[in-house]
Amino acid sequence: MGRLFVLTLEGKIYSCKHCGTHLALSENIVSKSFHCKHGKAYLFSKVVNVTSGEIENRMMMTGMHTVADIFCVCCGSIVGWKYETAHEKSQKYKEGKSVLERFKITGPDGSHYWASHDTHVAGSDADDV
């Protein structure tokens, strides 16, 4: 393994809730209308300091997508997923973008999001942008 380089962001930052590693800037949020099994999730145009898992096809609320889970590069915690391919034409805007689960990250103001006990969403994503 090589040397680990971790980028430090400036501005309104979303970080890994386990180790504090910077993951994304609020200015890169595309949508706050996404959902995961733990509650809310945000779609970002750019995330940093993550590694990708294996690419797989998943049936989500908006159809079939090819995705890869993403993990914090420092502590290895799963923090969301990245869209590789959207199989529906209307969902192509998601390609190359990443979703961070609010339950797994700390907000710019230091806020934590707790898992919603009412939420049960199979195949996590949303239609509205």
Curated annotation (Swiss-Prot):
It comes from the Eukaryota. Zn(2+) binds at residues 16, 19, 72, 75. Keywords: Metal-binding, Zinc. It holds the Pfam family Yippee-Mis18. One of its GO terms (molecular function) is metal ion binding. One of its GO terms (cellular component) is ubiquitin ligase complex. Residues 12-109 form the Yippee domain. Transmembrane segments: none annotated. InterPro entries: Yippee (IPR034751), Yippee/Mis18/Cereblon (IPR004910), Yippee_fam (IPR039058). Belongs to the yippee family. This is Protein yippee-like.
